[in-house]
Every structure is written in C-alpha cells, then in structure tokens.
C-alpha cells in the first residue's frame, strides 16, 4: 500500500531576498616570518648575477620549516581575518579552501578550521577543499560567490582561504618557491564586486604535477609550463571577450570589443615576476591582433610579421615576446607593478599568489583613486585550469587597506641567510610523512598570534597551538 503525499501539508519556505553586489568584503594575508634574498641566493648557488633577480624578476622568497604546514597557514590567515574585522563566527555559513599543499589524502584543511567555529556553537558551515595546482583558490572563490547568489543561500557570509608552501628540489626551480596564504570574507554589498562574466580554459597537461606522495616536490617541465601559462591566458581571455561581446549584444549595447583599455589594474597569478610581465605583454599582443589599427599600436615594429605569425610559433617567439613587453612596459610599470608587492617579497604562494596580487594593489593605491575602477584577474593552475574575470571596486577600501597593513608587515619579515632556507627544506624533507614526532623548528620563527604544529602522534593526528599575541 502506498500513502499519497499531500504537498500542501508541507510548509513552503521562501528563499531570502536576492543579494546584490556580491564580492570581497575583507581580505587578509599571511606569510611566514622569514624570507631570503634572491640576490644572495644567486651568490649562494654560484650562478651568474641577475639570473634570479633579473631573469626571473624575483627579489625575496618566504620560507618556513616543519613547524608550519598548510593547516597552520589557513588557521592563522582565517583567524586574523575574523579578529581584525570582528566577524561573528555564527554569521559564516560556508568556508571554501583552495590549496595544493596536500598533507592528507582524505581529511580536508577545512575540517581543521572548524574547531574555531565549533567553539562558537556553529557547525552548520558548508564547503570543503578545492584542488588543482594554483587554481584552487579561484575555484573556492567562485563556489562561495555562487552559493551566495544561489537559492541555497541562507543569508550568511562565506570565507575563502587559499594558501600553499611552494618548495622545489635543488635545481632551477628552487628560486621560484615561496609561501603564503589569503583569507577573504565574501558577501553582498561588497566594496570589491565580482562581475558576472568569467572566461575559462581547462585542459589536460603535464607541465607541473605532484605524483610522488612521499615528497613535497613537484615534477616540472619548465618550458612546457611557460607555454601552458601563455596558451591558457590566450584562451581564457578569448573566452571572456566572446562572452562579453555576447552579453553586450543581448543588452543592445554597441561600442568596441572588450580590451585592456577597459581595465584599470590587471592582476595575474605570479609564479615569478618575469612571468607576470610576459602575461601582461601577451594580453597586449592579443589586443593588437584584435585591433591592429588602433592608434596605440602605431609604433609597433614589424606589424605585418606579427599579424602573419602562426599561433604555435607565437608561443615561443622570443622576439615577439620582447617586442610586446616593450610596448606594454609603461602600462606595466604604472598598473601591474602595484600588484606585485607580495610576489616580490614572498615569492610564489601558489593558490594565494593571485590574491596576494589583489591585496598588494589595495595596499598600494589610495582608496579614493581605486574606487570605481575595474581590476582584471587571471587565475592559473598547472595541469591545467585557468580563468580570466573582473572585479569592480564599488565601495570604499580604506578599512581593507588599514587592516591589511601589508606594506609594513612585508617589510618587517626577517631576511635570513640562504643556508637557513636550505636547512629548513632539509628539516621538512626529514620529517615529511613522519608520525610520533615533535617538529624541530624553532617557535621563535612564528609570528605572534600565529598557529604552529606542536606534534604528530602515532596515528598521524596533528596538534596545533597558537603562539601568544604580541
């Protein structure tokens, strides 16, 4: 016998009013207390002067030992965000984490963050981790924004955390390491509003990957990683421009196609500084191909040759690259460089790199100047996943700039000898995957109020402690 269900006996629950201007309400950066000089690393590695500082465009690189892991990074970044902005833990309904620093094949970093909310009586928090190289934080951000804009939204805000420890085996990749984390408060009526169009490109590549679960070090195809990044920015930018044109047509709007002329401040994922210069120059090249007769390209040399260049050849043509880096230099120095503070000081932060760029921009440009401006964001993760999207600064960023206090904090990092970095990596190698141990790194290297790993027991359960605040 079946019993009919009378729908009228259920109470219909209406969704809350649709939110407007969903985006980033607040942002916080975390980075280790120590860094090394890339100039000193050149001498330490006995390589030619300028190989890292000019060739890679790097200045410093953050480092940490076995007292820190992705969970301590995430805990410190998130807790600092909550405390600086007096966020009620019960006002958070979702947490999304992006990272590629995997220390457990099952248990997410997000679960470690839940202790903070459980103490406040809030365990109703959606979201888990997203993983794909450096792209996970952007997937996390899109997930959080989409949740707030969906019918599932319960009226609360979200938090997005992204962070990584970027380290490499001895060799050419090691100078492109770094470390850091970002935490962002996501909600409606935000000063930094995510605009609705995303241009995305995804593919299956083996430019950078981590198949060795007994090691933190990646497998890297250096040349392929460069062409993969460049082809990804081409494809995601093209997808964005196509969607933008379609949206304009549907709205009955005319005018020229979208280009960098519509962007006030471009921000890029930064594996290393020179790659950002190449990426920006590549967007300028794409705009040139789309509108070669624009007055701003009148002085481009060998115009006919670049217009006739086969696409595949363009990916590795050093003359083309150098030409458009020259064309783009003034714009790079005046706009893109303002988003490079974290990258210059901390190096590659993987999932936090793009948002470290955003934080750097907000720290570098006065709130009155940046208000009303558009920021483009290029997210990239090897393997590969990439997106081009935009943020409109609709509100006042004064509070964000003041509470970030980014410039002073970056300058207060301890610059340590290169041998200290090598020793830190040796310590991490020695204790990677270890159980029943107490980390050997000094807690003097932890910022006041930062979390650190106290111990791992015989069942590989990690215990974290927070350092006293200053």
From Swiss-Prot:
Pathway membership: Metabolic intermediate biosynthesis; (R)-mevalonate biosynthesis; (R)-mevalonate from acetyl-CoA: step 2/3
Keyword terms, alphabetized: Lipid biosynthesis, Lipid metabolism, Steroid biosynthesis, Steroid metabolism, Sterol biosynthesis, Sterol metabolism, Transferase
UniProt xrefs under InterPro entries: HMG_CoA_synt_C_dom (IPR013746), HMG_CoA_synth_N (IPR013528), HMG_CoA_synthase_euk (IPR010122), Thiolase-like (IPR016039)
Induction of expression: Expression is up-regulated by salicylic acid, abscisic acid and methyl jasmonate.
GO biological process, one term: ergosterol biosynthetic process
Entry annotated with the keyword Transferase: yes
Residues that, per the record, bind (3S)-3-hydroxy-3-methylglutaryl-CoA: 134, 176, 225, 269, 278, 348, 382
Chemical reaction(s) catalysed: acetoacetyl-CoA + acetyl-CoA + H2O = (3S)-3-hydroxy-3-methylglutaryl-CoA + CoA + H(+)
EC number: 2.3.3.10
Gene Ontology terms for molecular function: hydroxymethylglutaryl-CoA synthase activity
Residues at the catalytic site: 100 (proton donor/acceptor), 134 (acyl-thioester intermediate), 269 (proton donor/acceptor)
Gene3D superfamilies listed in its UniProt record: 3.40.47.10
Cross-referenced NCBIfam families: HMG-CoA-S_euk
Family to which the UniProt record says this protein belongs: Belongs to the thiolase-like superfamily. HMG-CoA synthase family.
Function field: Hydroxymethylglutaryl-CoA synthase; part of the first module of ergosterol biosynthesis pathway that includes the early steps of the pathway, conserved across all eukaryotes, and which results in the formation of mevalonate from acetyl-coenzyme A (acetyl-CoA). This module also plays a key role in the biosynthesis of triterpenes such as ganoderic acids (GA), a group of highly oxygenated lanostane-type triterpenoids which are well recognized as a main group of unique bioactive compounds in the medicinal mushroom Ganoderma lucidum.
Record's protein name: Hydroxymethylglutaryl-CoA synthase
Gene: HMGS
């Amino acid at each position: 016998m079946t019993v009919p269900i009378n729908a009228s006996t259920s109470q219909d629950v209406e969704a809350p009013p649709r939110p407007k201007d969903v985006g980033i309400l607040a942002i916080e950066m975390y980075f280790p207390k120590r860094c090394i000089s890339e100039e000193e690393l050149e001498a330490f590695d006995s390589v030619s002067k300028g190989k890292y500082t000019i060739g890679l465009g790097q200045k410093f690189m953050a480092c940490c030992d076995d007292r820190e892991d992705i969970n301590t990074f995430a805990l410190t970044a998130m807790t600092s965000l909550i405390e600086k902005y007096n966020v009620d833990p019960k006002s958070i309904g979702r947490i999304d984490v992006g990272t590629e620093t995997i220390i457990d094949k099952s248990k997410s970093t997000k679960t470690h963050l839940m202790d903070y909310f459980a103490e406040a009586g809030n365990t109703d928090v959606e979201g888990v981790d997203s993983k794909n190289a450096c792209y996970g934080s952007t997937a996390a951000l899109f997930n959080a924004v989409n949740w707030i804009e969906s019918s599932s939204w319960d009226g609360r805000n979200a938090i997005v955390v992204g962070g990584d420890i970027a380290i490499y085996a001895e060799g050419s990749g090691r100078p492109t390491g770094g470390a850091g984390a970002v935490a962002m408060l996501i909600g409606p009526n935000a000063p930094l509003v995510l605009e609705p169009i995303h241009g995305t490109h995804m593919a299956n590549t083996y430019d950078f990957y981590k198949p060795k679960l007994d090691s933190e070090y990646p497998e890297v195809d250096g040349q392929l990683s460069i062409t993969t990044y460049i082809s990804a920015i081409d494809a995601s930018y093209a997808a964005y421009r196509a969607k933008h044109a379609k949206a304009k047509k549907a709205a009955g709007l005319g005018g020229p196609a979208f280009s960098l002329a519509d962007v006030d401040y471009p921000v890029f994922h930064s594996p290393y500084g020179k790659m950002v210069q190449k990426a920006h120059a590549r967007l300028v090249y794409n705009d040139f191909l789309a509108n070669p007769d624009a007055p701003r390209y009148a002085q481009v040399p060998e115009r006919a040759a670049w217009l006739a260049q086969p696409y595949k050849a363009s990916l590795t043509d050093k003359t083309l690259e150098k030409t458009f880096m020259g064309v783009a230099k003034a714009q790079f120095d005046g706009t893109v460089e303002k988003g490079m503070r974290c990258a210059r000081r901390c190096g590659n932060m993987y999932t936090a790199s793009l948002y470290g760029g955003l934080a750097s921009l907000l720290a570098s440009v006065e709130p009155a100047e940046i208000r009303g401006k558009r920021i483009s964001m290029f997210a990239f993760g090897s393997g590969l996943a990439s997106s081009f999207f935009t943020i409109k600064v609709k509100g006042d960023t004064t509070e964000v700039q003041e509470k970030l206090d980014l410039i002073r904090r970056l300058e207060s990092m301890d610059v340590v000898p290169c041998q200290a970095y090598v020793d830190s990596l040796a310590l991490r190698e020695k204790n990677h995957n270890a159980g029943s141990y107490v980390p050997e790194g000094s807690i003097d290297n932890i910022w006041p109020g930062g979390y650190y790993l106290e111990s791992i027991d015989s069942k590989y359960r990690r215990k974290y402690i927070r350092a006293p605040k200053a």
